[in-house]
Amino acid sequence: MLFRKMVVVLGILLAGSLQADGHMPDEAALLKKAEAFIDAFYSFESEKLAPLLEYANTSADSILYYQAWAEGGNYKVMNRGGCKFTDQGTVKCPITVEDDLVLALKTGFLVTDTFEITFVNSEIGKIETSSNDQPIYYEARDWVKANRPEIMQTVCNDMWKSVDKAGECVRAMHEGYKAYFDSIEKSGGA
């Protein structure tokens, strides 16, 4: 009986110390902040996203551009994976989307964009993005650059620099991707 009481008391003390040292609540708070970032990003409202990027000096502009690009490209979340810590201490949030550019290529593929968030002193310090775009996506982009230079010289001239032009740029790229698909379909390659 005494042993059982000691085990219960020890368990209570250990549980209390885990919460007192802040380890678990910090992880939970960071994951909550990462999920809030994803909510804000896909709200397509920059005024919700910008405050979360206050300390992300090196990536804030590109993330705000990407948000405007995603809105202009009609990104639709198809599967929202939960944000999770990596072995490197960052948080990864995989989001599978449907978007106009990929739809123009008629592959039936859904792209997963992954946001890797680095926290500094409990604030978002840096965000890197990656995706599993298929090779045809990059082939189409290169085709647009070569065959529709007016797109690259006008609305996409400041690509990834001018948030104000992001939506217009992605819509022009969408037209270019459709033209690319039509060209390979006509040549018997699709």
What are these regions (language model features)?
Residues 18-43, 186-189:
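Short, low-complexity N-terminal intrinsically disordered segments enriched in polar/charged residues
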Residues 53, 95-99, 130-133:
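A mature extracytoplasmic/lumenal domain signature
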Residues 66-118:
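Surface-exposed, charged secondary-structure patches
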